[in-house]
Amino acid sequence: MPVTSELILAALLLVGVLAKSHLIAAAACILLFIKLARFDLAFNFLEQKGLELGLLILLLTIMVPLANGKISERDIIYNLTSIPGLLAILGGALATHLNSQGLQMMQADPAIIFGLIIGSIFGILFLGGMPVGPLMAAGIAALFMEFFKYTK
């Protein structure tokens, strides 16, 4: 019996439920529904705009404390001039670089996402992680791959 995309999505749904990763389970469930409903336009939309839409929602969520006044001007100045704040700036710059590397890797080899999902599930189960960064995971994988190239 050939392995179909429906079977893979069902397996990811099951693994997501068993691993208590509601995000992975929900994503697999939604994609399985779209696939079974033959709503191919949704796949096109998600491929073209899904990442931007997801990042927009993430940024909106992160920026809410700025918008609702929970972060003061004093907090902002402190975080731009303190060691933790400067390290956060450095971390943000490094993360965006790694994210771009991860995006390039996923565009060059879309099948790599399966490994990233499995790695995310392992991270949830064994490291208490949260699967919010497939781009970061891909970026770290790209960094590992570059390191591996140089050590050969």
Swiss-Prot record:
GO cellular component: plasma membrane
Protein name: UPF0756 membrane protein Daud_1310
Localisation: Cell membrane
Main location: membrane
Segments crossing the lipid bilayer: 14-34, 51-71, 76-96, 112-132
UniProt cross-references to PANTHER family, sorted A to Z: UPF0756 MEMBRANE PROTEIN YEAL
Membrane topology: Multi-pass membrane protein
InterPro entries to which the protein is assigned, alphabetical: UPF0756_TM
Superkingdom of source: Bacteria
Family: Belongs to the UPF0756 family.
Keywords from the named record: Cell membrane, Membrane, Transmembrane, Transmembrane helix
